[in-house]
């Protein structure tokens, strides 16, 4: 054992990914010897994100080993060309045998090891199929031991279930040092990197990206992108300040109110809680005297974001009344406030 005061801080200096948004979420960069888990829906951009991070680390720090059990080397090359990635220090291996991958990593001593994905890996010591609980547990345990002994930071990609949880044993999240979720709607360009667990930093920071043709582009000022196409000549639009972690973001909310053609009016919410919308409409009708019982009401949060803060109630109510009365909300106005009964 080593006395705590004798441990040099320089020995745990962080490695920057040169992605400001990712470094923000990680607490300043990658900690050597850390085991990190990245989860997210299929097709959301997890592999794209880690390929771009691998390129940056390879260019600025040293060799990176990217091990894929889901794509061949040719498929990885095609993806890399689309992302304009062509670094000689980025080494790729297409294999599902974790023992062989760790042998290669031990010989190379890379500055970063990426496993894509943990559900495709297996070890011959366990008599079970890849992706099973026992295989995922054992493979993660070996990766944890390897990265701690060699002081090599390692990122593993994990699939998620229909409920949004990372597939595999629950203890998987307890074994790793950092758990990140990559979220967003596939039909929208915005992506959010969220920290669920971080032994080396805060879990209240988020990173925001846009999926473009060349890959993921970090957004240091997401408010400008979210409000870029807002019209100042249309009613039913308002701006809120939405807290994503500890990060305030300006977001546009929209509303459309039309006379219903059926007996029961429709209430539809995209990115906003439907129950809160129903409460808002009841308050507007009872307390403010607006007739909404014969109106279909549709509300939407721009960018595919989901807002669930009570402080967004008032801006949504203003957007609804704005469209109902065809009155335009000033573009330089931000509306905040919780609406009670």
Q: Where are the regions a protein language model picked out?
A:
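Conserved nucleotide-binding/hydrolysis micro-motifs of P-loop NTPases
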Residues: 42-44, 70-74, 82-85, 96-100, ...
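Conserved P-loop NTPase/AAA+ ATPase motor core
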Residues: 205-340
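Nucleotide-state-sensitive switch-loop elements of NTP-binding domains
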Residues: 59-129, 134
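Residue-level signature of catalytic and energy-coupling elements of molecular machines
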Residues: 25, 76, 116, 158, ...
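The Walker A/P-loop phosphate-binding site
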Residues: 2-83, 102, 106
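Phosphate-binding/switch region of NTP-binding enzymes
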Residues: 144-231
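P-loop NTPase nucleotide-binding/switch module
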Residues: 1-29, 121-129, 217-220, 227-233
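Flexible beta-alpha connector loops of hexameric P-loop NTPases
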Residues: 11-13, 39, 65, 87-95, ...
């Amino acid at each position: 054992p080593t006395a705590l005061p004798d441990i040099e801080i320089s020995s745990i200096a962080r490695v920057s990914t040169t992605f400001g948004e990712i470094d923000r979420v990680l607490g300043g960069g990658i900690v050597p010897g850390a085991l990190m888990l990245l989860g997210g829906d299929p097709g959301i951009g997890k592999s794209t994100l880690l390929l771009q991070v691998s390129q940056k680390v390879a260019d600025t720090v040293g060799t990176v080993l990217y091990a894929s059990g889901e794509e061949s080397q040719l498929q990885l090359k095609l993806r890399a060309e689309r992302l304009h990635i062509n670094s000689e220090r980025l080494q790729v291996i297409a294999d599902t045998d974790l023992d062989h991958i760790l042998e290669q990593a031990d010989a190379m001593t890379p500055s970063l090891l990426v496993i894509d994905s943990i559900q495709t890996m297996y070890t011959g010591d366990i008599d079970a199929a890849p992706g099973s609980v026992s295989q995922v547990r054992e493979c993660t345990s070996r990766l944890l031991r390897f990265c701690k002994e060699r002081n090599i930071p390692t990122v593993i990609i994990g699939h998620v279930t229909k409920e949004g949880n990372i597939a595999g044993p629950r203890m998987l999240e307890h074994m790793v040092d950092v758990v990140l979720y990559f979220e967003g709607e596939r039909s929208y360009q915005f992506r959010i990197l969220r920290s669920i667990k971080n032994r080396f930093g805060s879990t209240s920071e988020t990173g925001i990206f846009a999926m473009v043709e060349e890959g993921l582009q970090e957004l240091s000022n997401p408010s400008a992108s979210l409000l870029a196409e807002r019209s100042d000549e249309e009613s039913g639009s308002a701006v809120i300040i939405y807290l994503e972690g500890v990060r305030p973001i300006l977001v546009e909310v929209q509303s459309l109110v039309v006379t219903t053609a059926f007996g029961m009016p429709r209430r539809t919410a995209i990115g906003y809680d439907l129950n809160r919308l129903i409460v808002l409409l009841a308050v507007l009708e009872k307390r403010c005297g607006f007739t909404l019982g014969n109106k279909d009401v549709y509300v939407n949060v721009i960018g595919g974001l989901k807002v669930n803060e009570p402080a967004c109630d008032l801006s949504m109510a203003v957007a609804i009344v704005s469209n109902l009365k065809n009155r335009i909300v000033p573009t330089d106005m931000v509306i905040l406030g919780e609406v009670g009964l």
